[in-house]
Each structure stands twice: as C-alpha cells, then as structure tokens.
C-alpha cells in the first residue's frame, strides 16, 4: 500500500508530519511518499527513516491565505504533485495543508464517484457511548440542496458500516428539533426524501451528536463546520478550566492524581489528534484532510485512518451503494477527467 503525505502548508511545519510518519511506520507496513521541500525535511529524517520513504522535492505549496483555485494552476505545488501520484497508482493521500485546495484538486483530478453530486468532509465526533459519531458535511459545501444531503447520508452510512465496522448504522438529520415539522426548508425537504431509506432515524438536535443517539449525523457544510469548530473550542476550554482548577490547591492536585485514568479517557475522547483526519468522501480514491494544527499523533492516526479506508474499499462500497440505493444515481455522470 502506498500513501502520499503532503509535507507542506501545515501550521507547525514539516517536523510533526515527519514524526507522525515515522511513528506510523513503526506500527504498520506501508509505502510512504513524502512530497515537499527536501531542504526543510532532510534535517528531520533519520537514515533509518530515509530508507523507508520516498521523497518528492518541491518548494511550492498553496498558502492558507491563497485562493483554493490557485492549486489548479500551480502544477509544481506539493498538493498538485501529491494528487497526481495518487491518481496514477498510489492508494491514499493525507494533507494538513490548504483544505480547499485539497478538496478542489481531489474532485478535478480524481473525479467524483458516479452518482455523487458533491463530495463531503466526514469527521468523527466524541460520544458518551463506546464509539464516536460520524458527522458530514463538515465544511466542503456551505450551500446545499436536499439531493446533496441524501448523498451525504448514503456516504456516511457506508463509511460507518465498512470502515468503522458499525452494524446497521442509523442516520440522523441535524435540525433545531426532533419533530418532523422542525427545520428550515432544506431540512424539511431532505427529511421527506430520507424517509425512503431504512437507515434513517429522523431529525436529531445538536446535543444528540454527543449522546450516541445515532451513528451518522447529516447536515450542510456550513452548519457542520460550525458544529465542528464549536466542539473543538468547548473541548479546549474545558481542558483549560480543569488545568487551572487542578493547579489551584493541593487537594485538587491529589484528586486529579486519583482520577488520572478518567482524565486520560476524557482527553482521548475529546482530542482531535486521536481521530486523525477527515476523509473526503465521494471522490474515486482515499483522501484524508488533516487539521492544519496537526501534531505528530494526529498525522500518525490519519495514516491509520487512510489504511483503514483503503483496506475496507470504501470508495468501491460507496459506488455500489449509489448504484443500488440511490434511485437517481444512474442519471448522473462521473466527473472523472484529466486536468
């Protein structure tokens, strides 16, 4: 299995990415192709690691403040070269760089799965249950039609079932109330259409995401990204409050030591790094979009996630799902093209 890792554009430079790759190679067998500035990367690559990875040199990359469309023009940028390697034989790609550039190039270079109108970012959310919930779209499509959300539901269902191993996953539609009559026009129309699918649970509220009421939560990319960023902010704030209170007195420090295992579990469930990255579902190969602030652990977990998506053949499973479950899938044409 060959995995392409974009070294460029992340908030903390190349070091956390290289460390993440190194750790993953200690635990899993895969071919790693690193794409980025060799001069910046070489000081952090040991002789042992150098023997295990392939390095593709380029100094160009799409900066966060640049438009995503720049990626189409910049054929020597790290994400363009990486996507080209993926298209021509690699199995998966991971990038913590410009997410818009990654999404745009994935759609143009890899093409959409037949029947998929819009690819979606799929992310895992912490839950009080033993397994996380799946949320999509987490930011790829801010303006949506009901048909897009149907696609998201089908893709999320297949991801939960094939990659995460959830048995008969239930899909909920994010709304401002659980009643069928609640929601804006988009939610109401989508609700009517989702009733045709056995996996549909009904409307769910924001709080239900973390209760494990359903396995997959579907919404437009604007709402999904707000939910995601709010969750990250709340988790960070709670962590800071705990740290301040623990440091406040000796009794708190002693209590914290006694509850160390519980705190470790809480941290693991709420730390984005443990979830790796967010798969871009709906394109013809496995693409994982990692957080710009990713540390070594996040990159390591993103690689494990990529391996799981490839082994589970999620792209093929989504293709078959659209052929069998989506009535209108046969009327759509694949967006595969040579850019």
Curated annotation (Swiss-Prot):
It is an enzyme of class 2 (transferase). One of its GO terms (molecular function) is phosphate:acyl-[acyl carrier protein] acyltransferase activity. Belongs to the PlsX family. InterPro entries: FA_synthesis, Phospholipid_synth_PlsX-like. It is found in: Cytoplasm. Keywords: Cytoplasm, Lipid biosynthesis, Lipid metabolism, Phospholipid biosynthesis, Phospholipid metabolism, Transferase. This is Phosphate acyltransferase. One of its GO terms (biological process) is fatty acid biosynthetic process. The gene is plsX. It catalyses: a fatty acyl-[ACP] + phosphate = an acyl phosphate + holo-[ACP]. Catalyzes the reversible formation of acyl-phosphate (acyl-PO(4)) from acyl-[acyl-carrier-protein] (acyl-ACP). This enzyme utilizes acyl-ACP as fatty acyl donor, but not acyl-CoA. One of its GO terms (cellular component) is cytoplasm. HAMAP family: PlsX. PANTHER family: FATTY ACID/PHOSPHOLIPID SYNTHESIS PROTEIN PLSX, PHOSPHATE ACYLTRANSFERASE. Homodimer. Probably interacts with PlsY. Pathway: Lipid metabolism; phospholipid metabolism. Its EC number is 2.3.1.274. It holds the Pfam family FA_synthesis.
